[in-house]
């Protein structure tokens, strides 16, 4: 499971391909914040990031318990839920001073596949899917959107 974090690091980062359905670019495969801050993705990323109001009490709880956490985040730049939730996730991660080297961001195509198959065996059927690991063991998931709050 967690071996996906490190085995795929030699692949192309922030690979953009043409999406026939939307007639624009979409990211596929391993990505990072820098990819989301490039056009055309920066339009929705920056808007949602800036507009999200943090729950400061919840952020403090997360900050106190995030030391041994790592995250796999599957998303689609073509997906409305991903466009809404992923910038908010980054806002929370920034607020808790999360080390982004412990975040693996994988962009999927419309069929929920990535070029290197990082999703294989992880039961990814919807995006975004955020998987939390503590000491290399999965401890939770948020799929599409949270029930109450991302924090």
Give, region by region, the residue ranges found by the protein language model.
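N-terminal targeting signals for export/organelle localization
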Residues: 1-57
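Local sequence-structure signature of Cys/Sec-based thiol-disulfide redox active-site neighborhoods
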Residues: 62-95
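Extracytoplasmic
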Residues: 66, 98-100, 127
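Structural recognition of the beta-strand scaffold that forms the well-ordered cores
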Residues: 71-73, 104-105, 132, 141
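Thiol-based oxidoreductase modules, predominantly thioredoxin-like and allied folds used
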Residues: 73-76, 100-115
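Sequence context surrounding c-type heme c attachment/ligation sites in exported
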Residues: 90, 94, 98-104, 121-122, ...
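Structural alpha/beta surface segment adjacent to cysteine/selenocysteine redox centers
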Residues: 114-127, 133
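Non-catalytic, surface beta->alpha helical segment in thiol-disulfide oxidoreductase systems
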Residues: 126, 131-151
